[in-house]
Structures are given as C-alpha cells and as structure tokens.
Amino acid sequence: VSNGCVCCVMEVSSQGIKMQRVEGIFFDIGVFLNIEPDHIGPNEHKDFDDYLRCKSLLLKQCKVGIVNRDDEHFEKIIEGHTCSLETYGFSPEADLRAEDAKLVGGKGYLGISYHLKGLLDFHVEIDIPGKFSIYNSLTAIAICRHFKVSEENILKALKVAKVKGRIEMVKV
C-alpha cells in the first residue's frame, strides 16, 4: 500500500479460512467459483460439509460476494452471507448470464462465444473453448464491472487472456 498498490487479487483457500490466516481482513470482493470434493482428508477438511462451511465463510468477510449461480451447492454457500450478492452463470436467475454459447473455430483457432445479459449486455468471444472458460470470463467481467472497466477494455483483455499449456494449439 505504501508503494502505491491500490488493488490486490489473492486466492484465499478454504484451509486458509479454516486456519484463520485471513482473520481480520475484510475484502471488498469475495468470489466463489465452484466446489468439488477434492480437499477432504486429514490435512485439510474432515468431510465435505466442513469444506463447504469453510468456503462459505468468505461471504461473511467481504462487502460484495460474486457467486456462481449454477453451482449445485449455491444455496449452502450463500447461507448466512453478510455481503451483498451478485451471481453469474447460465441460470436465468443469474445477474450476469451467458446465453447462446457457441464454439467458434477456424484455421488454427478454437474459441467460444456467448451473449452476456443481465447487469451488462454485450457479445463475448474468448480464445479458450469450454464451459469453464465461460465461467472464468463471467467472473472476470463481474469483477471488472465493480472497477468500472469499460466494455471495450474487458473485451480486449478477454481476447488475449491465456494460460500457458491450457488448450494451447500445438503445430505439427
């Protein structure tokens, strides 16, 4: 902060919440993408209910919670939240919705496009195909909306966003 940092993006694990590593930190935005039973064991969570409970605590430590409306555990995750909620997904009930998703392909190119509806309304195309990419882009868009990032800049950033090694074209 003293060096001019105005924003920090950090991953907060359920284990970090459980071990109180972020106790006393009140986040502007907390994001819930999804939950799968993959952190169960003696070193993390005793069972799925404990894992779910710990994940949901983030929504008591932030001003705004951005939550995947399509996750099957949505209702449990938001139970007892103290923040304002915004949702995203394919659900008609989501505040930011992806509609008309289509694979887009061409020579040496594979992507996905959809129409964003709800709190914002524009066409989105990303270079990484798959439903997970739509969810990731919806999350990014929801966060950008809070920082008043323009539609033009959101679209530019989504067009160049890449993860090395993930759905990467390999020339043969």
Model-flagged regions — what are they?
Residues 1-80:
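Flexible active-site lid/hinge loop adjacent to a nucleotide/diphosphate
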Residues 44-52, 79-172:
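Adenine nucleotide phosphate-binding catalytic loops in nucleotide-utilizing enzymes
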